[in-house]
């Protein structure tokens, strides 16, 4: 290469280096200004000292995250700031008055948090905002009409009995049982039969276990990514081992939901079947999606349908399984309340050969115990919102638009200013006529974006508790006490292990 050519290359490299340095300086300035803006915005919300780079991340390790949260709930009234890393912060909210103000507004889900779910569940009801969310919510609400929910009770009972039959065989050999796995299979079986008109049994189908494992993998991977500054970039994440594992898990999940959708489409194509379904007063969840016409006259796309199926398949079995497992553990840990529930159910159902819709409103003490367990162990421990406009709270503190709020349902439910002796299991908190703040108890979130399937979930919990207590006495396994840890849903670090004794 000639001297002039070398000089030209050297000059280009110098220019490129200068441009690169300039871009780095601009990015550094942007990050600095962002941090200064956050410091000013959050100055009314104190928090423990944080590191300039990694924030409070060392304090909030996954396996101990709930304990520092509860310390903050006691120390900082109503809300406090939490720094994830240098330029990423949020405000933790755990006060019912604050919750009420936020949930009265139609704030969007925080994209910085929820966008990580898109490869898994797409842009369905959980992630939509604005008019698109309103239209989809209105379209899907009839799927949870009481006329639809009534016959589901029988389907739920059949799925529960399959699980209990398996438990009876297992405890004949060993009374110790880990319940999260089988409860997850049962709730998947239930949601597939009720909402997706599935004819088989997820509890005996080997494919269902691989689907549940993929769901567990996705929850762990996404929650770990949320906590990592390095993995926020989509390109870096796709190239990482975690990103490739996430892609494989998404593929398994989508294969499962595609198969469910295709089976229903095939069934509807049978002669006369589509007309029979259309004559029904209320359509099932999947049929609403398949028959839906948006207001502009176009059908939902295949992508839209799968997003809703992925969303409700996951939420309908996973969060419900978490709730049921913790409810059974709470009853196992409080035998006097367990026995009172059992006596109530025996008086109502006798031998328990059948349970119907009408029975569900006739078990008040059991319902009180379920609600108290959901207070102690809310299935979804937090939800995120991003302020679209400034907000002022009842105590006069305010936040500007653009701030992320983490509405800590777990913190709210364990707030001693809201619930005296919050760690004590006390079903009388939910006795008829007992007074409490309208936003003190939110196991299914609140406001217009509350859980659309909350009645379905409560019904299933009642069916499970009733039929289980008729067949088994429950006790905790003292050698393996569950350790609640934060996640997309509330989970236990070491599973939920019970000792079961068959009732003669």
Curated annotation (Swiss-Prot):
Cofactor annotation: heme
InterPro entries given in the database record: Cyt_P450 (IPR001128), Cyt_P450_CS (IPR017972), Cyt_P450_E_grp-I (IPR002401), Cyt_P450_sf (IPR036396), Cytochrome_P450_Monoox (IPR050196)
Gene3D superfamilies for the chain: Cytochrome P450
Family note: Belongs to the cytochrome P450 family.
Keyword Iron found: yes
Membrane topology: Multi-pass membrane protein
Localization terms from the record: Endoplasmic reticulum membrane
GO-annotated cellular components: endoplasmic reticulum membrane
Subcellular location, principal: endoplasmic reticulum
Domain of life, per lineage: Eukaryota
Function: Catalyzes the 6 alpha hydroxylation oxidation of taurodeoxycholate to produce the pig specific bile acid taurohyocholic acid.
Keywords: Endoplasmic reticulum, Heme, Iron, Membrane, Metal-binding, Monooxygenase, NADP, Oxidoreductase, Transmembrane, Transmembrane helix
Chain segments annotated as transmembrane: 6-26, 110-130
GO molecular function, one term: iron ion binding
Expression sites by tissue: Primarily expressed in liver. Low expression in kidney.
Organism: Sus scrofa
Any Pfam family the entry gives: p450
Lineage: Eukaryota, Metazoa, Chordata, Craniata, Vertebrata
Catalysed reactions, semicolon-separated: taurochenodeoxycholate + reduced [NADPH--hemoprotein reductase] + O2 = taurohyocholate + oxidized [NADPH--hemoprotein reductase] + H2O + H(+); lithocholate + reduced [NADPH--hemoprotein reductase] + O2 = hyodeoxycholate + oxidized [NADPH--hemoprotein reductase] + H2O + H(+)
GO BP annotations listed: lipid metabolic process
Enzyme Commission identifier(s): 1.14.14.57
Protein name: Taurochenodeoxycholic 6 alpha-hydroxylase
Binding site for heme: 451
């Amino acid at each position: 290469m000639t001297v002039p050519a070398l000089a030209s290359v050297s000059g280009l490299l110098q220019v490129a280096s200068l441009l690169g340095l300039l871009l780095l300086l601009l990015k550094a300035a942007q990050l600095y200004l962002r941090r200064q803006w956050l410091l000013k915005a959050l100055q009314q919300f104190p928090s423990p000292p944080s590191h300039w780079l990694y924030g409070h991340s060392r304090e909030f390790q996954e396996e101990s995250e709930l304990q520092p949260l509860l310390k903050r709930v006691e120390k900082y009234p109503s809300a406090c700031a939490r720094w994830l890393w240098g330029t990423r912060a949020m405000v933790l909210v755990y006060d019912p008055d604050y919750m009420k103000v936020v949930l009265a507004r139609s704030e969007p889900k925080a994209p910085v948090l929820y966008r990580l779910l898109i490869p898994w569940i797409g842009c369905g009801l959980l992630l939509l905002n604005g008019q698109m969310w309103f239209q989809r919510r209105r379209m899907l609400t009839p799927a949870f009409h009481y006329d639809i929910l009534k016959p589901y009770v029988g389907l739920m009972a059949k799925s529960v009995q399959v699980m209990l039959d398996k438990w009876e065989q297992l405890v004949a050999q060993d009374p110790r049982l880990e319940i999260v796995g089988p409860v997850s299979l049962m709730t998947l079986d239930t949601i597939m039969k009720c909402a997706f008109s599935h004819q088989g049994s997820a509890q005996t189908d080997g494919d269902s276990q691989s689907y549940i494992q993929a769901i567990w993998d996705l929850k762990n991977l996404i929650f770990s990514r949320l906590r990592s500054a390095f993995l926020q970039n989509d390109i870096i994440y796709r190239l990482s081992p975690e990103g490739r594992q996430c892609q494989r898990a998404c593929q398994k999940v989508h294969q499962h939901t595609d198969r469910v959708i295709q089976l229903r489409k095939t069934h509807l194509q049978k002669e006369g079947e589509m007309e029979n379904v259309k004559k029904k007063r209320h359509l099932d969840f999947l049929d609403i999606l398949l028959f839906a016409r948006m207001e502009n006259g176009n059908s939902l796309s295949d992508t839209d349908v799968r997003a809703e199926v992925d969303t409700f398949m996951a939420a309908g079995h996973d969060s419900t399984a978490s709730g049921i497992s913790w409810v059974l553990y709470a009853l196992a840990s409080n035998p006097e309340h367990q026995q009172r529930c059992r006596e109530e159910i025996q008086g109502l159902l006798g031998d328990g050969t059948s349970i119907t819709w009408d029975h569900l409103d006739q078990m008040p003490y059991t319902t009180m115990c379920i609600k108290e367990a959901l207070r102690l162990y809310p299935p979804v421990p937090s939800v995120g919102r991003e302020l679209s406009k400034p907000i002022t709270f009842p105590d006069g503190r305010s936040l500007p638009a653009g701030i992320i709020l983490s509405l800590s349902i777990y913190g709210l439910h364990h707030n001693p200013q809201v619930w005296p002796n919050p760690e004590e299991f006390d079903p009388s908190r939910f006795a008829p006529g007992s007074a409490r703040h309208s936003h003190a108890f939110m196991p299914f979130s609140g406001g217009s974006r509350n859980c659309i399937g909350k009645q379905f979930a409560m019904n299933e919990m009642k069916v499970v508790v009733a039929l289980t207590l008729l067949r088994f006495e429950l006790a905790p396994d003292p050698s393996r006490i569950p350790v609640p840890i934060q996640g997309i849903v509330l989970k236990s670090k070491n599973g939920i292990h019970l000792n079961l004794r068959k009732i003669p």
